[in-house]
Each structure stands twice: as structure tokens, then as C-alpha cells.
């Protein structure tokens, strides 16, 4: 019997895998998406525990503004997700500071002046607003590294962007702040850095000015709440994908002359092309010793040990709360590496996420994987319980809710992520001054028919960054066919 060979086999159903699968299926290609979990979404999914639902990551759905990359991508597929547009992407809080990051620039500036008055606020943030909208209008580039010649030609496609933004690429973020917002208060600086970190995974000193500007500008680009949880976005995409096999763990991959074989405990899946939506630095283990394994293993240095500690809970609450908060702390808590925590709540009317009168909460704070992975069992439990207690107390004190109003709550560590989604490193590749985009892995490889998408390859993390990579991959595939 001749085995069926798909045009594309995709391994991993995160943002990159699901969006690529939907795109290629929409183009008439035969596609099989393999996902080891019983649901799609990876670290952007929604899961259920003891009858309650939680968003896995404390993420916003960004890039939904008119003409923006995420919105245009969904529209190209004819997918209309059920969304609630947010006037404010998130609210930053510390002591008397209460700063909503409005999409409307003037409304945001009014709130900013009442929290962080500065004579150059308007000129600085008008520039951030303008540069963000200009940056995302340039989308005709293609980025490939399959050969040196192709790489050089692809870099030339970025010339329109380079002409406008090259000075920002060559400048560090801290210098940009000193020039355009001199002598700001320590708390203002902390607020800027906290916002930067959730987007680029770097500090202001480590960031380029361009990375800083793009991170600060994302609230202006249209943010939305996904009704039914972030997983509802993947449910909508799944309907557009030719074949989806969930609960299917890939054990090994073999390469043949004109196709690849993904061996799973559910059988073998063959594809003329293979697309990996996995951390690049962990992908080599799926291949035999040889050039492909060596290629992926050279990216192990990109595993920066950065991850997240999570606190999930169901809050019985009649008090109106925002969908997203960033709480600024006096200093990082023990076993964390950030002086800010990000807290998300379900919409009060979203009874798919929580019963009436209740809210589903997802909280995240940066940590190191190594702080959790090698601990003895009792030490691990004690350390985890202590951090859960601290974070819960901060939420209650800052937002004016009571611990007794939490019906349930529990924590998750990098070890938890490794167990359930197969990766402990989260957040993608840091967007730093010393690592501009052209040093990052491309969406193609030196091997015919082997491609990559996701937050450890071009372009970046989050919905806009990963979809930019999917769009880039589509151009590579179009050029090759």
C-alpha cells in the first residue's frame, strides 16, 4: 500500500504552527498538523482544571488595529474571531501610580501627565506612535538564510525600512531615553522598562532604540480580549486546517530524498515538506546524528534560561477590574528576575471562562528555568508555595481584593511548562542591541523542504511577531514553488 504523503507536515500547534497550517490549507495544500497536547495554542492556549478555565499565558491579543498584521492575516483566511476591543491594553500600578495604556494617544498622554509629568512627554510619545505605525506599513521584505547569496539578496529587501529606522537600530535604548526623555524619575524609568521587557525580554540598557520604540508602541496598535479565552482563537484557526492530529507526540524524524517521516506513537506521517513550530535549540534531538541535528544544535546558545512563574486562580468578585494589569514592585521577589508582574482577568461577562460573578486570573513573572529544574522535591514544593503566597498577597493588596474571595488558586513553574508543553524556556529570543534581527534564525534552513516558525525564529514573539514570521515563510515558499 502506497502511504499518503502530505504537501506539508507541521509539528507543533502554537501560534506559528496553527497560523501556518491555516494559511497553507487556505492555499489548497494538503496539510497535517501534529500537536502533542489535546488542544492547540502552546503557551498561548487555554486549559481546563477542575472545571475552571485559564489562559496559559498572561498575554494580550495585540496587532488588531485597522491595517495591522494580525487583523489582515485573520481576514485573509476569512476567520472572524469573537473579540472585545480594548481601549486600554493594560494598566500599570505602583503606590499612587495608576497608568492605563490607552490606544488613543491623547487620552494616554492625559493619563501619563497625571502620573509622570515631563516637558517632553508629548514629543516622545508622538514619535513612538508615529514610528510604530510607519514600521508596520513596510511589509514587502523577505528574509532567508538558505544560502549566503539568498541571505544577501533578502537583506536588500529591508532597505526601505533601513532608510527610515537604521539610526534606531544603531542606538541603544538607554541613550534614546536620555536624549528624548532626560532626567525622568526612577519609577517612570521602571514603568518603561517593565513594558519593554514583556515584549523584547530585555532591559533598556540591552535593547536597541528600535526595539524600545516598538515595545512601547504596541498599545497603540489595537488590542483585544478573546471571548472564551485565547484558546478560542485556535479553535477558529483549527477549522481552517486540512488535518489536525492532537494528542500526537512526535518521537523521531527521518529524512528521505523527497519527503520527511514524522514517527509518532499514533503512527507515521509523511510530508514532502516539514515545518517545525518548536524551540529551535531543542529540535535537533528529533533527528539522527548528522547535518540536520548539528544545524539545530548550534542554536543551543539561544536558550537563555528565561522562563515564567505563573499563578492561576478563580476570583469571586463584583468589583470592576481591568483585563490586564502590570504591577510594579520595589524589587524582584526571590527566585524571580523582574520587578514587575503581569496579571490578566477574564471579562466579567465571559461565562465560558468563569461562572457568573467570577473571574479567571492568569499572572506571570519572569524567572530562570535553572531556579526550578534541579530542585529536590520538598525544596521545590516549599519554594513554589512561598512564591505563590507572595504573589497572591501582592494581587490582593494592590487590587483591593480578598484572599478569601479566591475559590481556587495554584502555581506553575518552568518545570510545569516542560511537562505539559515540552519547553521550559519562554518568551522567544531576546531582541537586544547586540542581536539585531538578521542574526536570528530564518524561517528556512539549508535543507530542502525543512522550515521553522515560532518565537525562536524570525521575526519575534507574540501574535504580531510570529505572524510576521508566518508571512515571511509564505513568501519563501512562494519563491521556491
Language model regions located:
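N-terminal glycine-rich phosphate/pyrophosphate-binding loop and immediately adjacent elements
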Residues: 2-140
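A conserved FAD-binding loop/helix module that cradles the flavin
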Residues: 58, 455-478
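General small-molecule cofactor/ligand-binding pocket signal
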Residues: 82-84, 244-247, 407, 451
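Active-site/ligand-binding neighborhood in enzyme catalytic cores
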Residues: 133-243, 247, 423-433
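A glycine-rich dinucleotide-binding beta-alpha-beta segment and adjacent secondary-structure elements
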Residues: 187-199, 401-460
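Short coil-to-beta-strand
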Residues: 205-210, 356-365, 446-448
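Mid-domain catalytic core of redox enzymes
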Residues: 220, 249-356
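C-terminal segments that line or cap access tunnels to active or ligand-binding sites in enzymes
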Residues: 316-415
Amino acid at each position: 500500500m502506497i502511504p499518503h504523503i502530505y504537501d506539508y507536515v507541521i509539528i507543533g500547534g502554537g501560534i506559528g504552527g496553527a497560523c501556518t497550517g491555516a494559511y497553507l490549507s487556505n492555499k489548497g495544500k494538503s496539510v497535517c498538523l501534529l500537536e502533542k497536547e489535546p488542544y492547540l495554542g502552546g503557551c498561548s492556549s487555554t486549559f481546563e482544571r477542575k472545571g475552571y478555565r485559564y489562559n496559559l499565558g498572561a498575554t494580550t491579543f495585540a496587532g488588531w488595529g485597522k491595517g495591522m498584521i494580525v487583523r489582515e492575516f485573520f481576514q485573509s483566511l476569512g476567520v472572524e474571531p469573537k473579540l472585545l476591543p480594548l481601549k486600554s491594553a493594560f494598566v500599570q500600578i505602583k503606590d499612587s501610580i495608576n497608568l492605563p495604556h490607552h490606544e488613543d494617544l491623547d487620552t494616554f498622554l492625559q493619563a501619563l501627565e497625571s502620573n509622570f509629568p515631563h516637558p517632553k512627554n508629548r514629543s516622545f510619545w508622538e514619535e513612538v506612535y508615529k514610528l510604530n505605525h510607519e514600521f508596520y506599513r513596510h511589509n514587502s521584505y523577505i528574509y532567508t538564510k538558505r544560502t549566503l547569496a539568498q541571505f544577501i539578496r533578502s537583506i536588500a529587501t529591508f532597505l526601505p525600512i533601513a532608510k527610515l529606522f537604521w539610526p534606531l537600530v544603531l542606538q541603544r535604548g538607554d541613550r534614546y531615553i536620555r536624549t528624548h526623555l532626560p532626567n525622568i524619575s526612577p519609577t517612570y524609568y521602571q514603568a518603561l522598562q517593565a513594558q519593554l521587557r514583556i515584549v523584547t525580554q530585555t532591559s533598556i540598557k540591552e535593547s536597541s532604540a528600535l526595539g524600545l520604540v516598538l515595545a512601547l508602541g504596541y498599545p497603540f496598535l489595537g488590542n483585544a480580549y478573546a471571548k472564551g479565552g485565547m484558546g478560542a482563537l485556535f479553535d477558529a484557526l483549527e477549522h481552517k486546517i486540512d488535518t489536525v492530529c492532537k494528542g500526537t507526540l512526535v518521537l523521531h524524524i527521518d529524512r528521505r530524498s523527497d519527503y520527511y517521516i514524522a514517527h509518532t506513537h499514533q503512527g507515521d506521517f509523511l510530508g514532502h515538506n516539514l515545518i517545525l513550530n518548536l524551540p529551535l535549540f531543542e529540535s535537533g534531538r528529533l533527528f539522527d546524528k548528522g547535518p540536520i541535528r548539528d544545524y539545530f544544535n548550534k542554536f543551543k546558545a539561544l536558550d537563555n534560561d528565561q522562563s515564567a512563574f505563573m499563578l492561576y486562580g478563580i476570583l469571586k468578585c463584583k468589583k470592576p477590574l481591568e483585563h490586564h494589569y502590570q504591577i510594579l514592585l520595589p524589587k524582584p521577589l526571590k527566585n524571580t528576575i523582574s520587578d514587575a508582574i503581569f496579571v490578566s482577568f477574564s471579562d466579567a461577562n465571559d461565562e465560558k471562562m468563569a461562572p457568573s460573578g467570577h473571574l479567571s486570573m492568569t499572572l506571570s513573572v519572569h524567572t530562570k528555568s535553572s531556579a526550578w529544574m534541579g530542585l529536590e522535591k520538598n525544596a521545590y514544593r516549599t519554594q513554589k508555595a512561598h512564591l505563590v503566597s507572595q504573589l497572591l498577597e501582592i494581587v490582593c493588596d494592590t487590587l483591593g481584593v480578598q484572599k478569601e474571595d479566591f475559590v481556587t488558586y495554584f502555581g506553575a513553574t518552568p518545570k510545569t511548562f516542560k511537562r505539559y508543553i515540552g519547553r521550559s524556556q519562554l518568551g522567544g529570543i531576546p531582541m537586544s542591541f547586540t542581536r539585531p534581527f538578521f542574526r536570528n534564525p530564518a524561517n528556512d534552513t539549508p535543507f530542502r523542504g525543512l522550515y521553522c516558525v515560532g518565537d525562536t525564529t524570525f521575526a519575534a514573539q507574540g501574535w504580531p511577531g510570529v505572524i510576521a514570521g508566518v508571512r515571511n515563510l509564505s513568501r519563501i515558499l512562494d519563491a521556491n514553488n
